[in-house]
Amino acid sequence: EACLVGSEMCIRDRCVIPKLLSRNKDENTLVHRTVRTHGMGESFLAEIIKDWEDNLSADEIKLAYLPSPGIVKLRLSLVGKDGKKIVDTLNKHIDLLYEIIPDQVYGYEDDTMEGVVGDLLTAQNASISTAESCTGGAVAKMITSVSGSSNYFEGSVICYSNICKINQLHVQESALHGYGAVSQEVVEQMAIGVKRKLNTDYGLATSGIAGPTGGTAEKPVGTIWLSLIHISEPTRHAS
């Protein structure tokens, strides 16, 4: 969003905004709906939903891509005189979008990832703990930024050294030597270890190479492994 200098702000506040408000009040209503997605870059997302996006023009809906690290917000905008009809039209297209990318949509409007996760854990009456290496407590910070997170978040173990992983999370030394600290095998053992150590339903672990040094040809800077363990579900991991 562009920054405005004083004179531009004055023109905006005294002329532009009152004119827009008057026009909307007397003639039309502008409604925005925002869909929040994750796990897919902007260009790839645009390719996947191209046909859906093309169909928006039939209802005169405008679409804006609003990317940020790890997240792409899709803002749908529609102008009209009938507010209810506008909302119904937008919701119809949002429902169609969800059918295309159900695994990527995590929320709407002002939802946050950490807030949605907290709601899901609360609904399940479940608890979670984290074991962090490359993220250095950042995951725990996100989770605990939500009011009431103490109801489902037990704690975090930050382990950077191999010794810490062995002593605190019971990671097997053979796995560290055989696969390296940044590997599926090790991050899975970290998740299991913290879940057992803190007695939670879920264990979430991260390990990676944050840089700027430490990368190799096989594991370049930016390589990250994540593992999520649950008491009744198979291991989930991603890199």
Model regions and ranges:
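Extended hydrophobic
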Residues: A64, R196, D201-L228, S232
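Accessory alpha-helical/coil subdomains and C-terminal extensions
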Residues: E8, R12-G70, R75-S77, K85-L90
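Ligand-binding beta-strand-loop-alpha-helix segment within the catalytic cores
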Residues: G180-V194
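Residue-level signal for inorganic ion chemistry
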Residues: L76, E132, I143, L204, ...
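Gly/His-enriched, cation/cofactor- and phosphate-binding structural elements
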Residues: K73-S127
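Short glycine-rich anion-binding loops that position phosphate/pyrophosphate groups of nucleotides
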Residues: S7, I71, G208-P212
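Single conserved hydrophobic/aromatic residue that forms the stacking wall/gate
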Residues: E1-G6, I11, I229-S239
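Glycine-rich, small/polar surface segments that engage phosphate groups of diverse ligands
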Residues: S129-V182
